[in-house]
Amino acid sequence: EGAEDPSQENPPQDIPSQEDPDQAGTNSEGSSGSGLRAAGFLVLAGDVLKTAAACWFCWQAAPELGHTALLYGGLGAVLGHNWPFWNKFRGGKGVAVNCTWLILYLPITGALCCLAGGGAVLLSGYLPLGAVLIAALAVPVAWLQYGGESAFIMAVSASIMLTRHWAGLQRMRRGEEPQFFRKWHY
């Protein structure tokens, strides 16, 4: 009678034991806002600080580049977050890193892109939609503010976000993606 009932759902797993690293962060209690909120805030703070540090370092290392130093510092933070060498190139999806970078590089319009993506999440309930929208909106904004090089780098970032959130977008299309703020969307 001490044996577990195999018909019951599996209990939540720790992040390191997840089979799919893309799902690990998405389903972790800290990132989903349920359960370990303090851990989630620490992860968010770490993402914000490492992105700010990367941008600051590039600004200090090459001040003659001006805003372009922030452009490449942020891209480095996004790449390092999504594919960290110390974790066998398996990382997160980069939403907080991307938002921080946009706000540092395009302070007002970057914040508006983030707000638009957040609004899409609140209205639809789908996190992948907001994540991809944030990065996609930044491409024309960067073009208008700083030109082609900036737009190209933002397009690279948008492509990364699309790739990292592709599975969630496909689940959305099939009606299988869980909705964030589910209680608001019945």
Protein language model annotation of sequence segments:
Residues 30-59:
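Multi-pass membrane catalytic core of lipid/isoprenoid biosynthesis enzymes
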Residues 87-90, 119-133:
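Membrane-helix interface "capping/anchor" motifs
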Residues 1-2, 30-35, 58-62, 80, ...:
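Interfacial segments of multi-pass membrane proteins
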Residues 111, 127-135, 145-160:
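Loop-to-transmembrane alpha-helix initiation sites
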Residues 66-74, 99-109, 151, 155:
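Structural signature of hydrophobic alpha-helical transmembrane segments
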Residues 55-56, 86, 122, 139, ...:
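Membrane-embedded alpha-helical segments of multi-pass transporters/permeases
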Residues 43, 76-81, 117, 121, ...:
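Alpha-helical transmembrane segments of multi-pass membrane proteins
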Residues 1-5, 9-10, 19-37, 170-186:
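Cytosolic, membrane-interface loops and tails of multi-pass inner-membrane proteins
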